[in-house]
């Protein structure tokens, strides 16, 4: 029993000792955390952000934490090394070690971030004093526009903005007003990003022409536009700029140097305009790959070469006023133009013997990769451009215009190109005044293309297409022209010199009008397969060759479309006759239309025929009109059953009107549509009603 009591007493002592030992171990004995850090200097306190094992204090870049004091809160039972109380330089990165009561270490890295000073909203600096005052704030980021100067007539001049060197970013636009009279933009050199730069406008060029150099040496990003309209600007230089999300426009009559060595992409237009003057001879954009909208370089009188060695795609090209001494255009990788491509030289228009275009550009070989032009490709006014072999790789084109290429003699081969204009525009081929050009090679089917060839100086441009939407061909040459054409889905015009002729024996139909213009002594009119002319057939000129070869052996209808098109409408100024659906002039006799059955529209108008025969003609929807036919005595139209009018003037041998008896009796011809004057016999409408078809014997 005594032993048992002793044992119980022993256990009680041990238990009491254990309880005393637990009371000496803190509850946070396993914790080793820094929970809060603040740093104070010059009356300002900055709270740190603690994330994971990093303590970050952010202060303005103008604030030094050397000599600052700090408050560091951490686990109460833990120990910290080094002791924050012993530190005075809080600008320096360092490591703090927190050791828990139980001996577990936790390291924290202390960092200082020097942040930019931001200014919200727009900043306007209209005077030198405002420049100095703003610079003193240390602001480095403006979250709006920066406006320097004023356009007011009495504004105080600002000559120096170098105090603004602390600026690094302008989220809005930098706008330079007229009262800034400095020669450079020194003071903006440290800016790396801007919303845009604006000096003058397209409507009002900047008046401060003392500004000669536009340069921001550290600028690498522009989220909007660079617009410089200032005729004093000579030098433009952005050494680090890689991308412009908007436009890049430089308009100056003094431009001497333009350097953009790192520029790759332009999200808007790229426009360099010399105001008809300029000093620069070469423009090189060594790294530009894309220009989303228009690429335009114009009115630089001294320009001799343009080079875009890496350009692949652009919205359009507008080089529409290149100097007459411009020598070289290099775009070897350019493949896609999503719009028009205008390559046009200035053209000096003097008298007949002194007109001239460009005299230096001989080829466009360094554009041979071009595959797509969705708009019009226009190449004009190049006297010495001898070849356009670069067009061979075209796969898609909207339209093609070649004009005043005086010495271009090589064939124009676009045989792989499909014509497909953007936005439902009409595709056209226009060739004019290309003196030595002899051949155009395309796909056979140009049913969606209107072709206009105006040959020049007794020249004829041969072509291979068989189907076309519209065809207009003009040449002063005097020969017989053989055309391969089979289908014209719109209007057809052909004009040639005296004594010439046309052979188009594969032509089956013309949906629009057919206008043939040969002044006189036509040798051939051969259209042996032609069955239909949907609009007017207007023969301008006089058929006066007795041995003319003619063939309209299958032509059955003329001007019978529901809404026929006309080459000539209204009335002739002589004798007031209507322009007919079939309108033709001759001084001799031809049986031109042996199977013609119907003429619609305004009917038939003939001039000067000695006889006129249409043995199969059944219908004339309008009137039968004739004038100046001194030998015409009758019409050979035995099957004619429909006629709504007669208009005869000066048919001095015509006296027998019995052919019209039926049409008068059936009231197909009414009194207002019966016009006869100057003929051998001039019956009135009532005479015809009374059966007086011939003069009384």
Regions found by a protein language model. Name each.
Residues 64-76, 164, 285, 331, ...:
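Extended Gly/Ser/Thr-rich low-complexity repeat segments
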Residues 121-127, 144-158, 171-187, 193-218, ...:
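Concave beta-strand-loop units of leucine-rich repeat
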Residues 2-9:
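Sec-dependent signal peptide recognition
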Residues 43-50, 72, 88, 139-140, ...:
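Short, exposed beta-strand/loop patches in secreted or surface proteins that constitute
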Residues 20-135, 140-144, 169-172, 187:
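Beta-rich interaction/scaffold domains
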């Amino acid at each position: 029993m005594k032993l048992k009591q002793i044992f119980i007493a022993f256990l009680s002592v041990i238990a009491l000792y254990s309880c005393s030992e637990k009371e000496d171990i803190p509850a946070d004995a396993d914790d080793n955390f820094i929970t809060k850090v603040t740093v104070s200097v010059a009356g300002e306190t900055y709270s740190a952000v603690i994330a994971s094992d990093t303590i970050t204090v952010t202060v303005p870049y103008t604030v030094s934490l050397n000599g600052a004091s700090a408050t560091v809160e951490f686990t109460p039972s833990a120990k910290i090394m080094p002791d924050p109380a012993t530190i005075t330089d809080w600008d320096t990165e360092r490591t703090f070690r927190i050791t828990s009561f139980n001996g577990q270490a936790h390291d924290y890295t202390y960092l200082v971030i020097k942040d930019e000073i931001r200014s919200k909203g727009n900043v306007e600096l209209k005077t030198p004093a405002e420049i100095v005052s703003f610079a003193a704030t240390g602001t480095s980021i403006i979250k709006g526009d920066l406006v320097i100067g004023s356009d007011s007539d009495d504004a105080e001049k600002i000559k120096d903005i170098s105090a603004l060197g602390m600026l690094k970013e302008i989220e809005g636009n930098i706008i330079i007003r007229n009262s800034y009279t400095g020669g450079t933009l020194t003071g903006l050199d440290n800016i790396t990003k801007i919303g845009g730069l604006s000096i003058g406008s397209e409507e009002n060029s900047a008046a401060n022409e003392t500004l000669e150099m536009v340069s921001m040496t550290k600028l690498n990003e522009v989220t909007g536009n660079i617009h410089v309209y200032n005729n004093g600007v000579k030098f433009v230089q952005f050494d680090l700029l890689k991308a412009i999300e908007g436009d890049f426009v430089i308009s100056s009559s003094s431009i001497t140097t333009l350097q953009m060595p790192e520029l790759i992409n332009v999200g808007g237009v790229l426009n360099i305009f010399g105001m008809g003057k300029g000093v620069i001879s070469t423009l090189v954009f060594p790294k530009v790959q894309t220009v989303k909208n228009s690429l335009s370089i114009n009115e630089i009188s001294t320009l001799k070469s343009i080079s875009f060695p890496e350009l692949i795609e652009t919205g359009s090209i507008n080089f529409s006023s290149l100097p007459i001494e411009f020598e070289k255009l290099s775009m070897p990788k350019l493949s896609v133009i999503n719009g028009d491509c205008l390559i046009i030289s200035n053209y000096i228009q003097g008298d007949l013997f002194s007109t001239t275009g460009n005299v230096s550009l001989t080829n466009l070989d360094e554009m041979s990769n071009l595959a797509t032009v969705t708009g019009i490709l226009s190449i004009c006014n190049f006297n010495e451009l001898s070849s356009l072999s670069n067009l061979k790789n075209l796969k898609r084109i909207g339209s093609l215009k070649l004009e005043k290429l005086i010495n271009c003699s090589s064939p124009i081969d676009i045989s792989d190109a499909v014509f497909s204009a953007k936005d439902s525009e009409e595709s056209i081929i226009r060739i004019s005044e290309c003196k030595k050009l002899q051949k155009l090679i395309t796909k056979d089917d140009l049913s969606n293309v209107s072709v206009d060839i105006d040959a020049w100086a007794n020249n004829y441009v041969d072509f291979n297409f068989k189907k076309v939407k519209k065809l207009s061909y003009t040449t002063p040459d005097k020969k017989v022209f053989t055309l391969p054409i089979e289908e014209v889905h719109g209007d057809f015009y052909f004009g040639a010199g005296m004594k010439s002729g046309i052979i188009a024996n594969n032509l089956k139909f013309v949906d629009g009008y057919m206008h043939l213009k040969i002044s006189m002594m036509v040798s051939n009119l051969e259209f042996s397969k032609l069955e239909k002319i949907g609009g007017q057939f207007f023969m301008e000129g006089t058929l006066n060759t007795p041995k003319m070869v003619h063939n309209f052996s299958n032509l059955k209808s003329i001007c019978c479309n529901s809404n026929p098109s006309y080459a000539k409408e209204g009335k002739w100024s002589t004798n007031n006759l209507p322009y007919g659906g079939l309108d033709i002039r001759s001084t001799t006799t031809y049986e031109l239309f042996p199977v013609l059955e119907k003429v619609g529209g305004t009917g038939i108008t003939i001039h000067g025929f000695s006889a006129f025969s249409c043995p199969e003609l059944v219908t004339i929807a309008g009137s039968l009109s004739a004038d100046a036919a001194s030998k015409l005595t009758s019409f050979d139209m035995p099957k004619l059953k429909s006629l709504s009018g007669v208009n005869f003037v000066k048919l001095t041998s015509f006296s027998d009107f019995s052919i019209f008896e039926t049409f008068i009796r059936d009231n197909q011809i009414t009194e207002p549509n019966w016009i006869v004057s100057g003929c051998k016999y001039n019956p009135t409408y009532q005479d015809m009603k009374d059966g007086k078809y011939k003069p009384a014997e």
